[in-house]
């Protein structure tokens, strides 16, 4: 049986390597076979098991519709198992999208706090285990060195140790966000929203590789903005991102004062630059199909200049903390402009402190005139409205969403069709994200297989998506270690200590620490090295792709190191002699490690290898 399990692991690993590319079969029923076999009798000189001659015509094994649905779900989710593929095939793609749009939103912040509260509780409960190990270490030291007295701790000494132990727990920080994101991705059914939010997180970027990393709630609350607006309006998304305390810290318009020349203080220009360059209109004026406009001399036309950045920076002055951190009981004062980030409520948006806002008139972007004397929030909303209505937004954001969901090199016609939907959803509304996402997924260029073999089609699936799909579709169990400690006294002979390992199958906690995956393949949500994401949309790998003017963003993090490391991760995932697919940091607190359960797949393989291969091809 072990040899069969190893063979299954090898086949699964092989299918995961092949799954880097999105392949499918063209659905076509206009031919003999696939069930079009009325009046035809097929005979064969030899038949065995399921390989009956009549199956060559009667549609047995014809999975084109399910393979196409599997391809669709690989674009729209983090991974779908056979049951979901079959269900989605029955109801159809458009009905599936509608179903997804109407699902309740699974926000990360409540889950983040639930996780932290459980860790705090289990940390306190685990003190006895820590104390038993501590006393055993003292006993071992005294045994090895006769000059060291064996321990016999007093209750006062134990209480002091317990107080110190409780102080060692740090958080919540980025680790708890990683736990919450992983568990939500693995557990929740609102997969399209989860996938779109992940795409948006690579466009409207913040990163835990900053001060935000010390505050998990700042990451989860920001991600909730992306979840909330995934099917909303892009204008509302852009405004809420601009007011996010997390974004304010990351791109430094939090506590951004108006100019004070006598103190040589000028408004910070960071967010003003990036909200144009990366979050809305890009660097150059675009046609609706995403190609660059040219001036009379044939040069690209910039969308803004340095004066525009300076003027827009004045707009984003005066934003500060909305309230103080409710988890810090020692804070008894109200929030104020200039309050340290560490003392503020990271889950609330910034508010305007009018006395710190530049109230003079602003003129920018060849047409936006903001009059003097206005409230600061009015200035900001005018600027956001102007950016939102800029003709670049549709092709600039639409192309990147296509890249994140469908393909790296969408045709100009594809981009233009998405731009048209962004500009008008058919009901006179601009920026309708639900309509845009549906149009991207259902566009003929996304659904047809006719051009799959063309050199400019497809995309390199990033390592996070490849790994997530495998983690979601494979059957899983948990390995949990339970400890029982009794103290008769606090000496070498006073401890009764037992542990037991059990397997759990229900209510698994998919708490992936994320950092190990990031270290291996250079990617995990909200861990990009800069505001420019893990890769730029216009990245061109050196060689044939660059020579053919093709883009391959994901190739930026695909090198000899990450490629080998990803194979190593697959090996750990699939090798049956490893204890876990991933480790959380808290197994010592009684939290389970996640393992794959190959028993059912092994039984299928033993009974019918052909069916097993069929399952693996549909899944991955």
Where are these regions (language model features)?
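Structural motif
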Residues: 59-67, 172, 187-194, 266, ...
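N-terminal mature-domain "stem" immediately C-terminal to a signal peptide or N-terminal signal-anchor/transmembrane
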Residues: 32-106
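Bacterial N-terminal signal peptides that target proteins for export
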Residues: 2-10
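N-terminal accessory alpha/beta regions
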Residues: 80-227
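Bacterial N-terminal signal peptides
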Residues: 11-20
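Flexible, low-complexity segments enriched for small/polar residues
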Residues: 45-46, 51, 70-77, 204, ...
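Active-site substrate-binding loop specific to GH73 endo-beta-N-acetylglucosaminidase modules
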Residues: 39, 44-48, 89, 135, ...
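Boundary at the C-terminal end of the N-terminal hydrophobic targeting segment
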Residues: 23-25
